[in-house]
Amino acid sequence: MYLPNFLDGFDRLVAFDAETTGKRAPDADFVRRQPFAWRAPGIIIEVGFIEMLRDGEGWRKGEIWSSRVNPDGPIDPEAIKIHGIRPADLKNAPRFPTILPRVKDFVGESPIVAHAYKNERDFLDYEFARAKVIPWGESAYAEERYICTQVLFAQLFPGAIKSLTSMCDRLVLDSSERDDRHGALLDADMTADALILLERQLKHGESGAPRSWTST
């Protein structure tokens, strides 16, 4: 459970989201059972990061960064329907090992804000291991580094649908851009906006949206 002051000790957060091939990250046991010549296919095809900087009692957005990623593998057609990213769009995109130093530099020592954080954590762990930066089965970032807006939203709004779009609708955040397709930077941006409002709700019991948006 998140306490009202759980972010008070931080001056910088990083909101993160990834778009993927639609495949789940296999567990370490599966990977270890594969033949020596087996090459782990990539999963992440786009990353989006939003820097959040302390601004008085709240937060402001700082640097943003996103990149597409060539997974060297197929993309599930159902995933393409969601994010609209096709293999041809990634032909000249960097591989994950190429952007990995930038990922590590951007995150630094800051907490990572994500919606349904276990998915994003698993994707990062897989790609870090695939790049031979960490062993299979280990984590790129400790679990306590993650702040999950889905968990916080469920804490404040028990029983509500917890998807990113539903959360934004409940918080009166415009999520209409997601109607056509998802994107890593867009989703990271909405996750950052949601955290700002959810923290305010947790601390003060306030609606995050201006009164004129919520009055009937």
Predicted regions and their residues:
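Short, P/G- and charge-enriched loop/turn segments at secondary-structure junctions
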Residues: 2, 32-38
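Metal-dependent phosphoesterase core characteristic of DEDDh/y 3'-5' exonuclease domains
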Residues: 4-12, 26, 40-85, 104-216
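Walker B beta-strand of ABC/ABC-like P-loop ATPase nucleotide-binding domains
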Residues: 15
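Short acidic, Gly/Ser-rich segments with clustered Asp/Glu that frequently serve as metal-coordination loops
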Residues: 18-28, 35
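Metal-dependent phosphoesterase signature
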Residues: 80-100
